[in-house]
Amino acid sequence: MATFKVSRVETKPYDGQKPGTSGLRKKVKVFAQPHYLENFVQSTFDALTADKIKGKTLVVSGDGRYYSEQAIQTIIKMSAANGVKSVWVGQDGLLSTPAVSAVIRERVGKDGSKASGAFILTASHNPGGPNEDFGIKYNMENGGPAQEGVTNKIYENTTTIKEYLIAKELPNVNISKTGVTSFSGPDGQFDVEVFDATETYVKLMKSIFDFQAIKKLLSIPSFTFCYDALHGVAGVYAKRIFVDELGANESSLLNCTPKEDFGGGHPDPNLTYAKELVERMGLGKSNTQGEPPEFGAAADGDADRNMILGKRFFVTPSDSVAIIAANAVEAIPYFSGGLKGVARSMPTSAALDVVAKHLNLKFFEVPTGWKFFGNLMDAGVCSICGEESFGTGSDHVREKDGIWAVLAWLSILAHKNKDNLNGEKLVTVEDIVCQHWATYGRHYYTRYDYENVDAGGAKELMAYLVNLQSDLSKVNNIVKGVHSGVANVIAADEFEYKDPVDGSVSKHQGIRYMFEDGSRLIFRLSGTGSEGATIRLYIEQYEKDSSKTGRDSQEALKPLVDVALKLSKMQEFSGRSEPTVIT
């Protein structure tokens, strides 16, 4: 058994190591600077109490993006030096973010241990490669992202760090082969266990969903299916679940080989970046591929996000979570005993609110960031939650879960088609959504993203909008000047959240303008980009009249869009005449 000593390496703080909503994300060239990664990892160890580190087991894996291999080896060596007893690594360093959460919560190691936390190496939906993004975040023993108290402490430590601990001479571990490698150090034996990345997660999915019912659906000749992993880590799980377990043809999988640069693409499952899937589903500009599949879905780099499509039909994430919640008890065995409650992020449309009211469920509106849902789940008051940024999930783990959302939709389709196994007239994705609108009304919804805007201009825009809120008569003069048919603004504020579980308060979570007819305009600066600022504008309008729920959303929302752009002086502050992405 190889032995190692602990080295103390002198270092100096780097500016800007403040974790955002999902960890620290920077360009690879920033992370590759001497001591940069080590400073952040040591600051994380120092922010955690000894009982969470000494003699404990940690998970270290990620989405396979460029720089992951080096980072995993560094974190293994630093874990050994900081008194960790065992490190678990997914084979090839791969684990989806929801799978990491499942592994922390469910897996038992060869030595009988359970994990007390994880370093997840991902920048989620951001591009990968030598000139692109890398990221790291820490998840706690509940499987969820570190709470603000911990991330604030990590940041504080990064500003004062003087040294880090590392087992320099520990040889690199072969992470392509499953098995345990053991070393001897000052605190005794240190193990690195490389394990099958899919096993724990697949077992969990099989305990939640009726795989036989989904298999029957996929065997209907007229039910065609397409899944695009955008060369992210989801591909590993897609092959195992959709092909091996559920019997789908391998030809129904697109871009399911993980690549460190995501094939040169942008692994963000939306109508702009998932071009190949969008074309195949009949939603592209050209429609030369014949009849589209009945169901399509896509994932982001670390497989926590999802996009759901029907044939020539896009399901908004806000509608998706509402439809899953409305059908969960009937269609998904895990929820057969009823839902504890539901929650959405503030910018997400109020479609879920209407379902909660209709079904008499507890309902919560939280800031953007999955950790807020985790608190509600740990308290046993939330079963299903979602956010407009293509994140949907439930209390089976403490992260959003892209493949879970796809299986939820397949379960609903299987349930609606259970008496229709010859597939003569399938109940389609579009049918399910339109039936939902007929029952609950429709929330027309769109999001405008202005990416990599000058940070100064973005901050000025937000400050201007806050100041404007103090004079609603001025606001309504601007509104009516743009479009007389738009309802009056009756309230405007900056969203603030008091956590009902731990009492913590989160301020400055987005600027809201609320209209008399239930419409909303929301402005936020995003915390997930690696440079510049991203301004997000959310526009929502509720339509109860079922005869008016079939309009094109961009057409229905045009008056409100015009109001939002004028009200915010978007072009003046951002320097952009149009958004980077419209969803």
UniProtKB/Swiss-Prot annotation:
The active site is at S124 (phosphoserine intermediate). Alpha-D-glucose 1,6-bisphosphate binds at R25, S124, D304, R305, T368, E387, S389, K400. It catalyses: alpha-D-glucose 1-phosphate = alpha-D-glucose 6-phosphate; O-phospho-L-seryl-[protein] + alpha-D-glucose 1-phosphate = alpha-D-glucose 1,6-bisphosphate + L-seryl-[protein]; alpha-D-glucose 1,6-bisphosphate + L-seryl-[protein] = O-phospho-L-seryl-[protein] + alpha-D-glucose 6-phosphate. GO terms for cellular component: cytosol. Residues 1-20 are annotated as: Disordered. CDD domains: PGM1 (cd03085). Its main location: cytoplasm. Keywords: Carbohydrate metabolism, Cytoplasm, Glucose metabolism, Isomerase, Magnesium, Metal-binding, Phosphoprotein. The keyword Magnesium applies. Pfam families: PGM1_C_vert_fung (PF24947), PGM_PMM_I (PF02878), PGM_PMM_II (PF02879), PGM_PMM_III (PF02880). GO terms for molecular function: magnesium ion binding; phosphoglucomutase activity. Its EC number is 5.4.2.2. It is found in: Cytoplasm. Binds 1 Mg(2+) ion per subunit. It is an enzyme of class 5 (isomerase). GO terms for biological process: glucose metabolic process. Mg(2+) binds at S124, D300, D302, D304. Its cofactor is Mg(2+). The modification Phosphoserine is found at S124. Monomer. NCBIfam families: PRK07564.1-1 (NF005737). Belongs to the phosphohexose mutase family. Catalyzes the reversible isomerization of alpha-D-glucose 1-phosphate to alpha-D-glucose 6-phosphate. The mechanism proceeds via the intermediate compound alpha-D-glucose 1,6-bisphosphate. This enzyme participates in both the breakdown and synthesis of glucose. This is Phosphoglucomutase, cytoplasmic. It comes from Mesembryanthemum crystallinum (Common ice plant). The gene is PGM1.
